[in-house]
Amino acid sequence: MIKVAIMGFGTIGSGVAEVLDINKKSIAARVGDEVELKYVLDLRDFEGDPIQEKIVHDYKVIAEDPEVAIVVETMGGVEPAYTFVKTMLEAGKHVTTSNKALVAAKGAELIALAKEKNVNFMFEASVGGGIPIIRPLNSCLTADEIEEITGIVNGTTNYMMTEMTEKGADFNEVLKDAQAKGYAEKDPTADVEGYDACRKIAILTSLVCGQQVDFEDIHTEGITKITPTDIKYAQAMGRAIKLLATSKKGPKGYTAIVAPFLLPASHPLYAVNGVFNAILVHGNVLGDAMFYGSGAGKLPTASAVVADVVEMAKNLDKNIPIEWSSKKLELVDYKEWENRFFIRTTADKAAVERVFGTVTYVQAEGVTGELGFVTEKISEADCEKKEAELGNILQKIRVA
């Protein structure tokens, strides 16, 4: 029998316990042995709940118990999760986590420590919730050179953009709705400002290039400045605004960005709506492959965590290599990246054409007193210079 411990009994941790219980027969069949939950680490007690008999309040109880082979970390945040996970790995225990903040900040170090101790540190659920993406990048797609990863990797913002598009509501309205439905946190900053998506694309880029990508180096914009007027223009163009996390390999190296983009109806991510996530991977041999599913939620995320538990239970005596060194990757400045841009301004046509040259104007129903136009393909740096020269800019959104 293989003993498991869970650190953190919130939404995801309780979901992991549930999946281990309801699927125990199929898990045992796949592993070749029973997998049983022995401990749950939490600050709280759960009187009247059967889980109470497994509750411990000191992580060292788990670390010092030789029976525990696999530890699940679902606490969130970098500390104390980092200290707890490091202790478990040093004690020779396999660890899986759903904690993107921990993986983005300490992934390379914890992978190296796991290798040194001949155990595994896995993190399938840290990106995309229930969507399998970490394991495919580390195994199925290793014959390819991954040239681009573009994803809708935050369910909160995708739900909000879908609601703004379908109902014509403004940002504050849909945020309140998302919070009421449990899709957005009381403090939604990490989601709506793009920080959550930034950490996820940092993790994926680190896996693809095999080096440490610091999320602080990724240019990040959220959806807080998107307005109903922007949605009207998008609809007039037959496009949808989506918050994308994108990483590309170019002649000089990797560039990454998180920002709203205007997607055409032909784009694979155009129809990804609501709380769903999708990640589009482009390989030099494979071409395009898309991974789609529930990007968040108790059981979808728990399913990804337990998939790691199963993988580790089948490989208790071996480390499965993950190529992600602590050597820092210097990203190419995103300002060198070329895009077309949709711009709204109160300047007149003569000024627009003097500064931007050839543009395509867009007319949106009910919008007056301004111009909307799409530029030719130019670099981010050039666009910024032209914006400053033109002045009177109301909005800028990249066009995919």
Name each model-derived stretch.
Residues 268-323, 329-336:
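ATP-dependent carboxylate/acyl-activation modules
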Residues 139-205:
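Conserved anion/nucleotide-ligand pocket segment
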